[in-house]
C-alpha cells in the first residue's frame, strides 16, 4: 500500500510570543521550522511568501513584534509515503489514536535524506483506518516526535479530531512524559529544575543550544535514580517540547547524554580504571506518557521498559560498581 501525497502549498502560521519581540524575521522562523535551513527561509522571505498579518514581508532582517501573526507559504517537494513492513510494537490502538514503542535508529518521519524506513512508513503498514492529515504531507498522524536515536513511547493520531485535541494537550502542557537518561559525570543535586531557553545553533545547524537562534522557553525537571562511578542515571520530565531539549540541557551542565556524540559525549566510555566501552545509540528512552483520551477524556498512561541494549549496559555498570 502507498499513499501519494501530491505537491501542494504548505501553509504554516505562527504567533509571535512576548519574549520574541524585536527578533529578526528569519531568526524567528528558523526557531519555528527546524526542517528548513536558514538560506531556504531567506529565499522564501525574499520571494514574498511570508506574510506578517495582512502585509507581505520581503526583508529577512525585519523585526517581529509580540502578537504578530506570521504566515509562511511554500511548495514542498512531492513526497510518497509508502507502507513498509517494519518491526513495530503497538502498545495500544483504537479508532482515534495509537501508542507505539519506537526503536532507536528509526526516524519518526521523512526528511532530508530519509524517505523510507521511518515510523510513518511502519504505521501505514500496521495501523488500521489511516492517519490524521493535520501533521501535513511529511508527518501524517505525528502529534509529537522522538529523536532518531531515542527509543520509547510515542503517541499517534488516527484522525484530525484526535490530532487537534491531542495537540492542544501538548500546547497546554497537560501531557506528562518521563524519560530515562544516563549522563556522564555525577549530577550533584538529587532532584532539580533546568530552565534555559533553547534555540538553533548559529554555526552547526543540525544542533540546538542554550540560547542560539530564536531561543524558546525550555524547562526540564529531573530526579537522580542512581549514581555510578562515572555516570548518573536520571528520570527526566520535560515540561516543554523543544528539539533535543533533554540532550541540550544536560550537555549545557557538562553532563552530556551517554552515547550522544552530537552534544559532546565521548565515543569511548570510561567504565573502569583501564576499561572502555562503546554505546551505538543515545542512552535516552521515553519510558512513560500520560494524557487524556481525545474523545472520552479518560486518563491514559503507557510505559515502555528499557530496551535490552540499555538494560544490559546498566547491568554492566552495576557489576563495575561492586
Predicted regions: what they are:
Residues 90, 183, 221-224, 257:
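Conserved hydrophobic positions within beta-strands
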Amino acid at each position: 500500500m502507498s499513499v501519494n501525497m501530491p505537491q501542494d502549498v504548505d501553509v504554516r502560521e505562527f504567533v509571535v510570543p512576548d519574549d520574541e519581540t524585536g527578533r529578526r524575521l528569519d531568526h524567528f522562523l528558523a526557531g519555528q521550522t527546524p526542517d528548513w535551513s536558514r538560506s531556504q527561509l531567506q529565499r522564501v522571505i525574499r520571494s514574498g511568501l511570508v506574510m506578517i498579518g495582512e502585509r507581505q514581508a520581503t526583508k529577512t532582517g525585519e523585526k517581529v513584534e509580540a502578537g504578530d501573526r506570521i504566515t509562511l507559504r511554500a511548495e514542498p517537494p512531492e513526497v510518497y509515503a509508502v507502507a513498509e513492513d517494519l518491526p513495530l510494537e503497538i502498545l495500544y490502538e483504537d479508532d482515534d489514536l495509537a501508542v507505539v514503542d519506537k526503536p532507536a535508529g528509526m526516524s519518526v518521519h521523512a526528511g532530508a535524506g530519509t524517505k523510507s524506513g521511518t515510523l510513518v512508513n511502519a504505521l501505514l503498514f500496521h495501523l488500521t483506518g489511516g492517519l490524521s492529515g493535520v501533521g501535513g504531507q511529511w508527518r501524517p498522524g505525528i502529534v509529537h516526535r522522538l529523536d532518531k536515536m531515542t527509543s520509547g513511547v510515542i503517541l499517534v493520531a488516527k484522525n484530525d479530531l484526535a490530532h487537534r485535541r491531542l495537540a492542544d494537550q501538548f500546547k497546554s502542557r497537560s501531557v506528562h512524559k518521563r524519560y530515562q537518561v544516563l549522563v556522564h559525570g555525577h549530577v550533584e543535586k538529587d532532584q532539580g529544575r533546568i530552565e534555559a531557553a533553547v534555540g538553533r545553533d548559529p554555526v552547526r545547524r543540525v544542533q540546538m543550544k542554550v540560547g542560539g537562534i530564536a531561543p524558546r522557553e525550555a524547562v526540564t525537571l529531573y530526579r537522580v535514580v542512581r549514581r555510578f562511578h562515572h555516570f548518573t542515571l536520571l528520570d527526566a520530565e520535560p515540561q516543554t517540547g523543544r528539539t533535543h531539549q533533554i540532550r541540550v540541557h544536560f550537555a549545557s551542565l557538562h553532563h552530556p547524554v551517554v552515547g550522544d556524540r552530537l552534544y559532546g559525549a565521548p565515543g569511548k566510555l570510561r567504565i573502569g580504571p583501564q576499561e572502555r566501552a562503546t554505546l551505538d545509540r543515545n542512552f535516552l528512552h521515553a519510558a512513560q506518557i500520560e494524557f487524556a483520551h481525545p474523545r472520552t477524556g479518560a486518563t491514559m498512561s503507557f510505559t515502555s521498559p528499557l530496551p535490552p541494549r540499555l538494560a544490559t549496559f546498566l547491568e554492566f555498570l552495576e557489576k563495575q560498581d561492586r
